[in-house]
Amino acid sequence: TVIESGAILMYLAEKSGQFMPTEMAARYEVIQWLMFQMGGIGPIFGQVHHFKRAAKEQVPYAINRYYTECRRLYGVLNTRLEGREYLAGDVSIADFAALPWVFRHDWQEVDLGDFPNVNRWYDTLMARPALTRGMDIPA
């Protein structure tokens, strides 16, 4: 049994031979951006979702702190995607891990127009029929 989404994505990529390069430098570039999602995007965007949408009490400090960090992470993604189609070479599990969080940019009250490279990347991924079908599955 494999648990944790990042480990599951790595397992599936290894098993299928898809979406993870075999060349070491390219492989670790994908892993680096997968870990960026696991350690940064997921936790921070999740806190934005909680404090903006689910918390019974509005806590301005928490909302501001996580929203500010969320926008900073969008900036990191935007810089990374400048002149690149995907986060790490070809489309990879790093993109698949980050996409669901960006898909909920409306929950974060983030306008993708503020991050044109992220917006382009998002549109490119959402043009893939398999990803669109996956994002249509209720969580």
Give the label of every model feature segment:
Residues 1-71, 78, 83, 87:
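GST-like domain detector, emphasizing the conserved glutathione-binding G-site
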Residues 8, 77, 95, 125-128:
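Residue-level signal for nonpolar/aromatic packing positions in well-ordered secondary structure
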Residues 13, 101-102, 135:
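Active-site-flanking alpha-helical
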Residues 28-31, 97, 119, 132:
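Generic structural signal for individual residues within well-ordered alpha-helical segments
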Residues 40, 45-49, 86-113, 119, ...:
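GST superfamily/GST-like fold recognition
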